[in-house]
Curated annotation (Swiss-Prot):
Source organism of this protein record: Bos taurus
PANTHER family membership: ACYLAMINO-ACID-RELEASING ENZYME (PTHR42776:SF4), SERINE PEPTIDASE S9 FAMILY MEMBER (PTHR42776)
Active site feature: 585, 673, 705
Summary of subunit composition and partner proteins: Homotetramer.
Gene that encodes the chain: APEH
Name of this protein: Acylamino-acid-releasing enzyme
Amino acid sequence: MERQVLLSEPEEAAALYRGLSRQPALSAACLGPEVTTQYGGRYRTVHTEWTQRDLERMENIRFCRQYLVFHDGDSVVFAGPAGNSVETRGELLSRESPSGTMKAVLRKAGSTGEEKQFLEVWEKNRKLKSFNLSALEKHGPVYEDDCFGCLSWSHSETHLLYVAEKKRPKAESFFQTKALDISGSDDEMARPKKPDQAIKGDQFLFYEDWGENMVSKGSPVLCVLDIESGNISVLEGVPESVSPGQAFWAPGDTGVVFAGWWHEPFRLGIRFCTNRRSALYYVDLTGGNCELLSDDSLAVTSPRLSPDQCRIVYLQFPSLVPHQQCGQLCLYDWYTRVTVVVVDVVPRQLGENFSGIYCSLLPLGCWSADSQRVVFDTAQRSRQDLFAVDTQMGTVTPLTAGGSGGSWKLLTIDRDLMVAQFSTPNLPPCLKVGFLPPAGMEQEVVWVSLEEAEPIPDISWSIRVLQPPPEQEHAQYVGLDFEAILIQPSNPPDKTQVPMVVMPHGGPHSSFVTSWMLLPAMLCKMGFAALLVNYRGSTGFGQDSILSLPGNVGSQDVKDVQFAVEQVLQEEHFDAGRVALLGGSHGGFLSCHLIGQYPETYGACVVRNPVINIASMMGSTDIPDWCVVEAGYLYSSDCLPDPNVWSEMLNKSPIKYTPQVKTPVLLMLGQEDRRVPFKQGMEYYRALKARNVPVRLLLYPKSTHSLSEVEVESDSFMNAVIWMCTHLGH
């Protein structure tokens, strides 16, 4: 019988990609103030922000759309769009004032290389104020990221709080003629006489930053803008050893609450790392005193003030251990100064019970109107669901469990009106609203669609639960299972001719959930089945599962993926002679392990910024702690090369299995990757070339670890499918 013909002509694949990549992604939503009509009806506006790939401009564009939600206080009466979408250019951050009468916007303007930042205040139908932050020179660029960045209105709506890079002193050469002062001594010439005078010899002084995707972000400061006067103050009192972020105004505007990350003795990469030592602080605006509000030996993130301004909820994690773990939800009472753990770490899921908190950030709006419950989304095995937590009782109640098995994301909740996103592997994101029911009735949420997406035809999906064989059980953590999401063409002419692409996720402590993902959907439309494996160590399955992997990378995770592949091939009867691998970062690490340890299984391999040699990565990555911890050791900032540790790192690395590799490999590397430097992939490229294994390398000069820029993402997809089609055969 002839093998199934894949959609493999480049022009056909490009046309398919062009169509599917137009699906927009929701990035944010906020709710306007409640309006009562002259007839007594009540409504609120929903302002949403979206991103979409633009293949003509080769960039991600951002646009907004408004909706109206009419309601009767506890249910939605009518909801619909208010006009068409409008592209928003240059907006970095935006935030409505507490009353909803004003809006602050951080905007960049100007040509590339000469961009300036402006902070604008809008009121009704006009721009009330605009401040050229770049020209004022009080600080460096404003942080717009979700790690440190914030834009917070004071409760009085007279001041704005934000985070920016500390202003760096000017520097110049010792031989800068115009700066020489022949009357001064050597000491006087080397020191600035006034704050703005340049320091000689500091032109090439190294400034640390916070690693991958945080280039030039190293020394954040808290800044306050007085809207009336236009005066900007850089707050004092923050400890010298701490980098502040995620700040908001304390009750009564008496000061500022912020999360502070330790940057001594040096900074480590912070993106996707919830384990960086940090704590909660309060800095008094009158006296400049700084007070510690939480345990300073752990890691905290996303403090959120309750509507009654009495409580602060935040997430807490252990520090300097695996990057992503099961977290605690903590509550700090502003007036009693007592902290309690509302939701603790869950070692193991029992039946259908809650398996723990794995999100790295709480939504900016997460409190119920009565300041008693907190709503958030988190992975639960291979799904992502919404939950409500009673902060007094500690009870966790699902809001979206059951149903069609897709995944949810909370965008915001305000006065109990929730705005959420829902999607599945064959359904792009839908925008939904619903009221949070009274306590005890949470599972009765009635969701109303504001923006409905059309399901992508001819794609079906399911979740497979997998139990490792007895010989692969973990000695300490016995009985752990794991899952895989299988996405496949709905009605292939002959299932035995369907090729399969195996996709292990990166991290390793992350997970795939049953949400919309462009790449698996594309592969499925081309005729492939896609197997997304949540091996033991993935988030969403309890803390025991996460702790089972450090010290066992390169073996336990590899065996889990291979076991999933063999089980699915056996049950689904796909074409076992046409199986490919596609993985990035730790997923690339696993892919390279699999073609070395199981060379007969895989006919093609595509890897993006893979970890190849943990030992050689140690000295160049922004996360050296990852190398040590995942190899099974404890990390400390003063650790030096140890032959035993490095030997273990090498033994757990894919480079060890290179002699067995015969699968054709396509490497895709970002030259600006700080997480897994591209030299890792180069090391593998040379090793394969020396052994005459078919290998191709794509090096993207300005791309980072995720290879997510539109031009890079689209090019890498096309090259990946052509590589797989070529080496698996049509």
